[in-house]
């Protein structure tokens, strides 16, 4: 049996439609003993926990939100590295292989951002994937793969932030340690086939509720200023470090990105006034 390298933490709430595919991403490496899967559920009323348990995952219950779920997951983990993902994510074999190569290397890097590609067809999906490609390794992105000692030093996710900015907030504290963070070469797949524009805006509205608390916690931090800067979110992140060349190659996709960004911005401002 190989040495245990990685704890995969999956947070769930009524994810019966997605959890099996997510767990199956790690079948081969779990059999080899390199990876363990921990599912932390928040009061699901469907078959999520049953499916996860039948597939051999360790299943725990925790609420009220995903920060607490994630913290319980990595704390229960036995491996020196932890990866935090959602149930609607699938990790391709080449990405799993790269992750295990990185976690076995014992190098200086202590955490990784993982590029995301959304499933589906049509212009909106292409535009969203185009938008996401600009965020890799920026303050708009969020670390997902951590050396466990880094999580222990930071204390993990801030459980006072209900949902939305807890990823960004943890990144601030990880980077403050002075550790090296990198972007993986390979991506994960985010299964959002059923995610309509209406649902996207509803999710953004929900996530916006903790944003004021996050800003109050880090009022003068440069990353937070960028995250809430009109210039950076609508232009800066798309043109920095030579990324403007991508816009010239795909101008129509960029127009699609901007249209959705305007709607998201409107929803955020509307909820800030409540």
Language-model features: locations:
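A conserved acidic beta->alpha catalytic loop
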Residues: 25, 41-49, 89-90
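Glycine-rich, basic loop-to-helix element that forms the pyrophosphate-binding segment
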Residues: 61-77
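Short aromatic/hydrophobic "clamp" motif used to bind/position activated sugar donors
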Residues: 82
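Conserved donor NDP-sugar-binding/catalytic core segment of glycosyltransferases
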Residues: 90-123
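Acidic donor-binding loop at a coil-to-helix junction in glycosyltransferase catalytic cores
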Residues: 156, 163-172, 187
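Non-catalytic, C-terminal membrane-associated alpha-helical segments of glycosyltransferases
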Residues: 198, 203-210, 216-274
């Amino acid at each position: 049996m190989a040495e245990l390298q990685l704890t995969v933490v999956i947070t769930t709430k009524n994810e019966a439609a997605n959890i099996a595919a997510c767990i199956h991403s790690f079948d081969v490496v779990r059999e080899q003993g390199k990876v363990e899967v921990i599912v932390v559920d928040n009061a699901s009323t469907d078959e999520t926990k049953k499916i996860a348990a039948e597939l051999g995952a360790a299943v725990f219950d925790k609420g009220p939100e995903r920060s607490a779920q994630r913290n319980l997951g990595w704390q229960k983990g036995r491996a020196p590295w932890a990866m935090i993902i959602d149930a609607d994510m699938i990790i391709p074999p080449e990405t799993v292989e790269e992750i295990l190569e990185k976690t076995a290397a014992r190098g200086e890097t202590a955490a990784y951002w993982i590029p995301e590609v959304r499933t589906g067809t049509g212009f909106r999906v292409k535009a969203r994937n185009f938008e996401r490609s600009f965020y890799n390794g920026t303050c708009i992105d969020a670390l997902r793969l951590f050396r466990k000692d880094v999580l222990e030093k930071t204390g993990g996710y801030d459980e006072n932030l209900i949902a939305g900015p807890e990823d960004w907030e943890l990144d601030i504290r990880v980077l403050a340690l002075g550790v090296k963070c990198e972007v993986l070469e390979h991506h994960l797949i985010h299964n959002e086939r059923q995610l309509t524009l209406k649902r996207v805006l509803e999710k953004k509205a929900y996530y916006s509720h903790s944003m004021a608390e996050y800003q109050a916690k880090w009022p003068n931090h440069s990353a937070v200023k960028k995250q809430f800067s009109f210039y950076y979110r609508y232009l800066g992140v798309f043109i920095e470090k030579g990324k403007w060349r991508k816009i010239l190659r795909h101008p129509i996709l960029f127009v699609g990105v901007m249209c959705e960004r305007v709607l998201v911005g409107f929803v955020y401002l509307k909820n800030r006034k409540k």
